Swiss-Prot record:
UniProt pathway annotation: Cofactor biosynthesis; (R)-pantothenate biosynthesis; beta-alanine from L-aspartate: step 1/1
Cofactor remark from the record: Binds 1 pyruvoyl group covalently per subunit.
Similarity section: Belongs to the PanD family.
Highest taxon listed in the record's lineage: Bacteria
EC code: 4.1.1.11
Record-given protein name: Aspartate 1-decarboxylase
Protein's organism: Kosmotoga olearia (strain ATCC BAA-1733 / DSM 21960 / TBF 19.5.1)
Length: 115
């Protein structure tokens, strides 16, 4: 049997920018993408801790080490700069393939917190 399971998440990231007139997506610091095993154009769910909004969008690679978490297009209406969000990626696994998700916790400046 195949199941849709959490593959990874970036936990409590801070929205640093938003651009309503962009074509859509979320821009994520490439360093965080690598740590969370999230690829450019991958589908992610974004959960806004401040207002409870949940939405899906795709990922654009941001400058590595910049700390950028930017909401683009329609998603820019769903959060404010400074809001904290959880960015979740999923994968389809069979029971033999599954491994626990990668969790990347970050500071208010979107710097990874070492385990």
């Amino acid at each position: 049997m195949f199941r849709i399971m959490q593959k990874s998440k970036i936990h409590r990231a801070t929205v640093t920018d938003k651009n309503l007139n962009y074509e859509g997506s979320i821009t994520i610091d490439y360093r965080l993408m690598k740590l969370a095993d999230i690829r450019e154009n991958e589908l992610v769910q974004v959960v806004n801790i401040n207002n409870g909004e949940r939405f899906e969008t795709y990922v654009i690679k941001g400058e590595e080490g910049s700390g950028v978490i930017a909401l683009n297009g329609a998603a820019a209406r769903l959060a404010e700069i400074g809001d904290r969000v959880i960015i979740i990626s999923y994968a389809i696994y069979n029971d033999d393939e599954y491994k626990p998700p990668k969790i990347v916790k970050v500071t208010e400046k979107n710097e990874p917190i070492e385990k």
